[in-house]
Amino acid sequence: MQHELAQTIPELILWTKEREFSLSLSSDRLAFLLAIALYNNERTDGELLESDLQDIFRHVSNAFEQSEATQTQRANNAINDLVKQRFLNRFSSEFTEGLAIYRLTPLGVGVSEYYIRQREFSTLRLSIQLSIVADEIQRASNAAEEGGDERFWRNQVFAPLKFSVAEIFDSIDLSQRMMDENQQQIRERIAMLLSQNWHEAIATCQQLLDETSGNLRELQDVLNASGDKLQSQLLRIQSCLIGRDDLDFVDQLIVNLQNKLDRIISWGQQAIDLWIGYDRHVHKFIRTAIDMDKNRVFGQRLRQSIQDYFESPWQLYIAKAEPLLDLRDDETELNEAEAVGELPTELEYESLTQVQEQIIATMQAHLAPFREQGKPIDLGAILREQLAMYPLSRHFDVARIIVDQAVKLGMASQDSQAIYPEWQSINDNGAEVQANVIDQYNK
């Protein structure tokens, strides 16, 4: 009876220690390895001569603007380094007269594949992968229902699930992680655009947001369409294992595949939700920037566009909502005195304008020193401090005025970096605020 190989963490650590594995690839070394892999894919024999590697290194050296005087020596060092780190295997014998033959190792193929191929993740590729998985699982489930001895299960069920389905799941998982990295790069690019020239970058940012959101949704639709069918086929195989204690290794594999599939689908949806949150955060930042701009930039752009209209014509689109039907009856207007009656002195109306003017004057006097001294404004702390001085009935108006006055003074640098602030309690009745510290003041 064969036993499924299993490695524990201590075994893997010992295995790595015994073989003295060590990886270190600078940018030029990595570029050299990727160039070798790409060149190797175009060859039918998969073998490389040292002269081939020298030529490839010359292209890399020129791209990195390195000295030509030491090119041969640096090429030899780079080749030896890749051999030492087990990215390349070197073969030589007395028949080759000192001319070595090189082949990429599995590690070299894996690293280069990661950088070159995994970026080709697309809906078409995902559909093909899931189609292959569905066929393999279908054949395995049919074989499981036929039944047989342990050898039959290993060859007809375990083998295709282990060496085809599981590897494709791992490939999809790796592709998702590549998309995570791509999203992070897009976030950094958007942050850079908004911090440099946000009013010119709005269209570019919107395009990046829409493209990424569309790609995530399209890929998730493909996963959702296939996920339930794949899970049902795995359950079908699992039902055939009832009462077969000798097939525990197959049952464990099925559980692992179910977990992988659940993780892939779950993370795909979670990635969409996180991106939607980021999308809203960027739009909130842009709206805040527009509100604080006081129409200076957009006014200048509009005037310039009108002046240059004949040289660069443009179109103006106007969106107008349909007017709502007025259902009120003007003839049945109520007399205020009849409808309300006479109010007690305690309930007499106090002009909201007067209240607002008093609060605005107080807040301006309170916030001005922060700008003059360059101190950051923590809205959460200020709101807690000020609301404690007012009755609960005025908390909303006071909080709104404080926020309006604060954002007129400046903005938070963390907003442009898409950093989500924590919710802070601002009174004893459950009111909370979410705001980064304002640390950049308008000139």
Swiss-Prot record:
<dbReference type="Pfam" id="PF17192">
    <property type="entry name" value="MukF_M"/>
</dbReference>
<dbReference type="InterPro" id="IPR036141">
    <property type="entry name" value="MukF_M_sp"/>
</dbReference>
<dbReference type="GO" id="GO:0051301">
    <property type="term" value="P:cell division"/>
</dbReference>
<dbReference type="GO" id="GO:0007059">
    <property type="term" value="P:chromosome segregation"/>
</dbReference>
<dbReference type="InterPro" id="IPR033440">
    <property type="entry name" value="MukF_M"/>
</dbReference>
<dbReference type="Pfam" id="PF03882">
    <property type="entry name" value="KicB"/>
</dbReference>
<dbReference type="GO" id="GO:0005737">
    <property type="term" value="C:cytoplasm"/>
</dbReference>
<dbReference type="GO" id="GO:0006260">
    <property type="term" value="P:DNA replication"/>
</dbReference>
<dbReference type="InterPro" id="IPR036390">
    <property type="entry name" value="WH_DNA-bd_sf"/>
</dbReference>
<dbReference type="InterPro" id="IPR005582">
    <property type="entry name" value="Chromosome_partition_MukF"/>
</dbReference>
<dbReference type="InterPro" id="IPR038198">
    <property type="entry name" value="MukF_C_sf"/>
</dbReference>
<comment type="function">
    <text>Involved in chromosome condensation, segregation and cell cycle progression. May participate in facilitating chromosome segregation by condensation DNA from both sides of a centrally located replisome during cell division. Not required for mini-F plasmid partitioning. Probably acts via its interaction with MukB and MukE. Overexpression results in anucleate cells. It has a calcium binding activity.</text>
</comment>
<dbReference type="InterPro" id="IPR033439">
    <property type="entry name" value="MukF_WHTH"/>
</dbReference>
<keyword id="KW-0963">Cytoplasm</keyword>
<dbReference type="GO" id="GO:0009295">
    <property type="term" value="C:nucleoid"/>
</dbReference>
<feature type="region of interest" description="Leucine-zipper">
    <location>
        <begin position="209"/>
        <end position="237"/>
    </location>
</feature>
<keyword id="KW-0131">Cell cycle</keyword>
<dbReference type="GO" id="GO:0030261">
    <property type="term" value="P:chromosome condensation"/>
</dbReference>
<dbReference type="GO" id="GO:0005509">
    <property type="term" value="F:calcium ion binding"/>
</dbReference>
<keyword id="KW-0132">Cell division</keyword>
<comment type="subunit">
    <text>Interacts, and probably forms a ternary complex, with MukE and MukB via its C-terminal region. The complex formation is stimulated by calcium or magnesium. It is required for an interaction between MukE and MukB.</text>
</comment>
<dbReference type="Pfam" id="PF17193">
    <property type="entry name" value="MukF_C"/>
</dbReference>
<protein>
    <recommendedName>
        <fullName>Chromosome partition protein MukF</fullName>
    </recommendedName>
</protein>
<keyword id="KW-0226">DNA condensation</keyword>
<dbReference type="InterPro" id="IPR033441">
    <property type="entry name" value="MukF_C"/>
</dbReference>
<dbReference type="InterPro" id="IPR036388">
    <property type="entry name" value="WH-like_DNA-bd_sf"/>
</dbReference>
<keyword id="KW-0106">Calcium</keyword>
<comment type="similarity">
    <text>Belongs to the MukF family.</text>
</comment>
<keyword id="KW-0159">Chromosome partition</keyword>
